[in-house]
A protein has these predicted regions:
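Conserved glycine-rich cofactor-binding loop
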Residues: 6, 13-14
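Conserved glycine-rich Rossmann-like NAD(P)H-binding loop of the short-chain dehydrogenase/reductase
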Residues: 29-43
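The beta1-alpha1 cofactor-binding region of Rossmann-like NAD(H)/NADP(H)-dependent oxidoreductases
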Residues: 39, 60-72, 104
Length: 163
């Protein structure tokens, strides 16, 4: 499976992640579709990507784990023999709360999944590419998906918004 352009899409099983996976597939990329609990949706997305003529492999990972970024990168390299050429950090958790009801656990989980792991995943890609070639530049990229909460602040979904 080497010498293919692989894209890792976190949260690639449904909604926007699915659409991103299909767009990459139609553009000729092979897709690593990450999911946490949406295995059925991930399998459907894999079939749609394959129907579009692209390879698609599924990777299951809880991004709230402290070492999720390294584990996910390890999985990708084991499956394809190389780090992905592109990562689309699309996965997130989105749980309702407000400032008075926010808990340390909820804030930490949101921050881990929505901020820490995506940034560490970018670092893991950098380190893998650098290990392989001695340099860390060229044809690799990382895309971080944000939503309207960045510009539309309001008190609902407090932990999500601050993460």
């Amino acid at each position: 499976m080497n010498n293919k352009n692989w894209v890792l899409i976190t949260g690639g099983a449904h909604r926007l992640g699915r659409e991103i996976a299909l767009a990459f597939a139609k553009a000729g990329w092979s897709v690593l579709c990450h999911y946490r609990t949406s295995k059925d949706s991930a399998q459907k997305t894999r079939q749609e990507v394959q129907d579009a003529g692209a390879d698609c492999l599924l990777v299951d990972m809880d991004l709230a784990q402290d070492n999720a970024a390294e584990l996910l990168m390890d999985q990708c390299v084991q499956l394809t023999g190389q780090p992905p050429q592109c990562i689309v950090n699309n996965a997130s958790i989105f749980e309702a709360d407000d400032a008075p009801s926010a808990t340390a656990e909820g804030l930490q989980r949101h921050f881990q999944v929505n901020t820490v792991t995506p940034l560490l995943l970018a670092n893991a890609l950098y380190n893998r590419v650098r290990q392989g070639s001695g340099v860390a530049h060229g044809t690799h990229c990382v895309i971080h998906v944000l939503d309207q909460k960045v510009h539309n602040l309001n008190p609902d979904y407090f932990s999500y918004t601050v993460s």
